[in-house]
């Protein structure tokens, strides 16, 4: 008896289900060209519940009955999105636009969209849009959130017109011009608060919402509109409030779902849950599953369904998720099997390869081709290697390699002082001149960090250009500089002449340059002591004194600046970058050259006369010494126009007895003021506008050594006192107008070498900066 009753109930349920499906199949499927899929429906018995009833007005305009809004489109949830976020169906409706002060009146607050208790809520892709001058709009019924935005019509911002207020405001400002007509939406700007503004909705299930336009600003007139929409608005289509007001409506995206309470509709679909499907996918057993449903009983008690991957159709009608034949349709218009046979599966496909003969033929052909290509490649490599060897010999000879070898052999006691590297050694040392090995770049060349086979770390300077007419002078200069052995001068270790331009190898200084330690933010507290700065000044002065006086031939550096002063791990200074240096014979006192140097460090007398003397290096050293005392940059746009260069700033401060005001705050409290004062007097003498009144580097070096040696009651060497003539001198400085223009400049510090054989002829660097 019990068994018969169960069978009867099952038969009755099946019959009712068949009847429901039959009725559903006879229901209208479209209204006004818009698809109406189940659970939505038109007419009694054609929809799942009252929430989903669609009324087709005049057989052309569909309305969602429960909220009386025109329907634009209905779609199901996206299955692919479900594995990252809960997917919902989408129904787009037309919602009234709130307006104020427009030509034909309007709704001041708009109509309230209330879906409380319904299986609908606002999608998170909707935005609040407000259009019009001085329009402040906000959302209502979104407590505790406060959502709103304000649009203005201020024209104070200096932006291109095609990024301003769109075509309407372009015409209002410039008249009906062709330029305004040609504004392209490709160059348009999203609503940014000028003419129109936008605001995002609260990130939660919002079922009741309204739009309000603030009317407290009585002085602001003109049409203002505000609305919620899922469409994107730019200045070109969102800057005409009258046009938007005339439209009356805009589209809003609602998300819909199925209530799971009090009915077994979802269970009758035969769909798998997301959790079940995830387990099946893990075991590769997901094929054949047509639809999926996601349940949430903890918050709103809803369920959403979709067809699984490889299926399409309506998941809310049993059996309506149909398999996609990928072998016929392909994926994104492309065939799924480029080789072999495509076999369609329920929810997927596979590619079968049954005939192996083409594969064997293909492999044999490929192997033969590879052997042939390998032979050609080996022959190519052999010929290329021979060409490279011949090219290296050619470069070595052209770059003066034979002359250098001869001079190194005939120079007694200096045969091993300079090494001639081959190109392979330097390529290996720098990982084939890898970009990761670059230490710095300038107009003259690029410096790489390298490690030789003996473990020494070196700086490898690869020049950009070469003057072939001065290669002999270059070789002579290499020999001269290689003989310099001073602890405060970066050592030239050797060169490579097998490349198209000579490559120079210097010792590597690991601790950066003085500029970085003085002016860049750093955790190094060593530079906060006056003793370290004074020692650096002594080191620099000693190196320049050696170059000017003690070297076999006097050498003028010509580009002394803080970026060319390297610091080793013990913060001992080493002078670097001889790219513009010049040697002079003992019977000459100056060089006439093309002006080259760095703004802020350049001798003004040299700038005027183009005659570089040893006193020009003294001037540049004076600027560096002033940097050490003040901590200021040689050129700073933070200072006023008259004090823009440090030389002017420092000299005027010294004349006005304001030394204590300009001492670097990092050393002011811990320094010995008598030492700083003595050093400042030397810096002032070095910065004298007339070169003949400056001390020599030898005098400067001796005086700084004396300052460093005596800490109390010292009496530094006094130079001739300033006279009235100096006070009448007009400061001649390198003009610095702005951050973007400098009258004379030079490349950043790199290692390089250049020479001259005449003291009166115009000379340019071998590697121009």
Curated annotation (Swiss-Prot):
Domain of life: Eukaryota
Keyword Disulfide bond: yes
GO cellular component terms, A-Z: membrane
Membrane spanning stretches: 359-379
Cytoplasmic topological domain: 380-769
A Pfam family annotated for this UniProt entry: GUB_WAK_bind
Record-linked Gene3D superfamilies: Laminin (2.10.25.10), Phosphorylase Kinase, domain 1 (3.30.200.20), Transferase(Phosphotransferase) domain 1 (1.10.510.10)
Glycan-carrying positions: 58, 114, 134, 182, 187, 237, 262, 296
CDD domains: EGF_CA, STKc_IRAK
First-tier enzyme category under EC: transferase
Stretches the record annotates as Atypical EGF-like: 291-351
Extracellular compartment residues: 25-358
Signal sequence region: 1-24
InterPro entries (UniProt xref): EGF_Ca-bd_CS (IPR018097), Kinase-like_dom_sf (IPR011009), Prot_kinase_dom (IPR000719), Ser/Thr_kinase_AS (IPR008271), WAK (IPR013695), WAK-like (IPR045274), WAK_GUB (IPR025287)
Phosphothreonine: residues carrying this PTM: 593, 598
Residue positions where Phosphotyrosine is found in the record: 506, 606
Membrane topology: Single-pass type I membrane protein
Keywords: ATP-binding, Disulfide bond, Glycoprotein, Kinase, Membrane, Nucleotide-binding, Phosphoprotein, Serine/threonine-protein kinase, Signal, Transferase, Transmembrane, Transmembrane helix
EC number: 2.7.11.-
Subcellular location: Membrane
Family: Belongs to the protein kinase superfamily. Ser/Thr protein kinase family.
Stated role: Serine/threonine-protein kinase that may function as a signaling receptor of extracellular matrix component.
Domain remark in the UniProt entry: The EGF-like region is specific to this family of proteins and seems to consist of the C-terminal of an EGF-like domain fused to the N-terminal of another one.
Listed name of the protein: Wall-associated receptor kinase-like 10
Natural source organism: Arabidopsis thaliana (Mouse-ear cress)
Gene it is expressed from: WAKL10
């Amino acid at each position: 008896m019990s068994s018969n009753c169960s069978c009867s109930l099952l038969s009755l349920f099946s019959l009712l289900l068949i009847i429901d499906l039959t009725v559903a199949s006879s229901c209208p499927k479209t209204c006004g060209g818009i698809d109406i899929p189940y659970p939505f429906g038109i007419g009694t018995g054609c929809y799942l519940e009252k929430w989903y009833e669609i009324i087709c007005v005049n057989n052309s305009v569909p309305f969602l009955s429960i909220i009386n809004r025109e329907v634009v489109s209905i779609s199901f949830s996206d299955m692919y999105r479900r594995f990252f976020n809960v997917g919902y169906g989408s129904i787009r409706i037309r919602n009234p636009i709130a307006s104020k002060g427009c030509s034909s009146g309007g709704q001041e607050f708009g109509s309230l969209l209330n879906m409380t208790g319904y299986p609908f809520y606002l999608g998170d892709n909707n935005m609040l849009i407000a259009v019009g001058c001085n329009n402040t709009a906000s959302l209502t019924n979104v407590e505790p959130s406060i959502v709103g935005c304000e649009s203005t019509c201020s024209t104070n911002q200096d932006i291109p017109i095609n990024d301003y207020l769109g075509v309407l405001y372009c015409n209002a400002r410039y008249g009906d011009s062709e330029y305004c007509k040609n504004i392209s939406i490709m160059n348009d700007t999203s609503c940014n608060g000028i003419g129109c503004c936008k605001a995002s909705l609260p990130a939660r299930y919002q079922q009741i919402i309204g739009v309000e336009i603030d009317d407290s600003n009585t002085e602001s007139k003109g049409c203002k509109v505000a609305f919620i929409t899922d469409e994107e608005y730019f200045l070109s289509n969102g800057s005409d409030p009258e046009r938007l007001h005339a439209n009356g409506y805009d589209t809003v995206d609602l998300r819909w779902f199925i209530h799971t309470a009090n009915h077994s509709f979802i269970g009758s679909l035969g769909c798998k849950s997301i959790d079940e499907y995830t387990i099946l996918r893990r075991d590769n057993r997901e094929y054949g599953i047509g639809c999926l449903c996601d349940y949430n009983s903890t918050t709103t008690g809803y369920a959403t369904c979709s067809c699984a991957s490889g299926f399409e159709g309506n998941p809310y009608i049993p059996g309506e998720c149909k398999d996609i034949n990928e072998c016929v349709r392909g994926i994104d218009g492309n065939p799924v099997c480029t080789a072999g046979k495509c076999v369609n599966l329920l929810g997927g496909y596979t590619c079968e390869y049954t005939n192996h003969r083409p594969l064997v033929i293909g492999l044999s052909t490929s192997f033969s081709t590879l052997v042939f290509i390998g032979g050609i490649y080996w022959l190519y490599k052999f010929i290329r290697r021979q060409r490279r060897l011949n090219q290296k010999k050619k470069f070595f000879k052209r770059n003066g390699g034979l002359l250098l070898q001869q001079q190194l052999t005939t120079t007694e006691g200096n045969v091993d002082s300079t090494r001639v590297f081959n190109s392979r050694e330097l390529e290996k040392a720098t990982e084939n001149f890898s970009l990761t090995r670059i230490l710095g770049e300038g107009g003259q060349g690029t410096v790489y960090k390298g490690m030789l086979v003996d473990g020494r770390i070196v700086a490898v300077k690869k020049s950009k250009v070469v003057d072939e007419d001065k290669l002999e002078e270059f070789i002579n200069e290499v020999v001269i500089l290689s003989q310099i052995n001073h602890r405060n001068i970066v050592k030239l270790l050797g060169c490579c002449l097998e490349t198209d331009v000579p490559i120079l190898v210097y010792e590597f200084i690991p601790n950066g340059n003085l500029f970085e330690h003085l002016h860049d933010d750093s955790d190094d507290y060593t530079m906060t002591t006056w003793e370290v700065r004074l020692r650096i000044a002594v080191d620099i002065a000693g190196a320049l004194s050696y170059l000017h006086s003690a070297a076999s031939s006097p050498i003028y550096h010509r580009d002394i600046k803080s970026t060319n002063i390297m610091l080793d791990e013990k913060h001992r200074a080493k002078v670097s970058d001889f790219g513009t240096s010049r040697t002079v014979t003992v019977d000459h006192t100056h060089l006439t050259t093309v002006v080259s140097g760095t703004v802020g460090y350049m001798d003004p007398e040299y700038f005027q006369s183009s005659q570089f003397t040893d006193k020009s290096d003294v001037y540049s050293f004076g600027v560096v010494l002033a940097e050490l005392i003040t901590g200021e940059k040689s050129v700073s746009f933070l200072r006023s126009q008259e004090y823009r260069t440090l030389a002017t700033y420092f000299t005027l401060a010294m004349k006005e007895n304001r030394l204590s005001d300009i001492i670097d705050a990092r050393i002011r409290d811990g320094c010995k003021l008598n030492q700083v004062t003595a050093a400042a007097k030397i810096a002032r003498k070095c910065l004298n506008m007339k070169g003949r009144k400056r001390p020599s580097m030898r005098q400067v070096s001796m005086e700084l050594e004396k300052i460093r040696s005596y800490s109390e009651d010292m009496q530094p060497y006094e130079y001739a006192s300033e006279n009235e003539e100096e006070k009448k001198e007009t400061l001649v400085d390198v003009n610095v107008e702005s951050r973007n223009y400098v009258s004379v400049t030079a490349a950043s510090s790199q290692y390089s070498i250049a020479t001259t054989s005449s003291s009166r002829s115009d000379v340019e660097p071998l590697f121009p900066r």
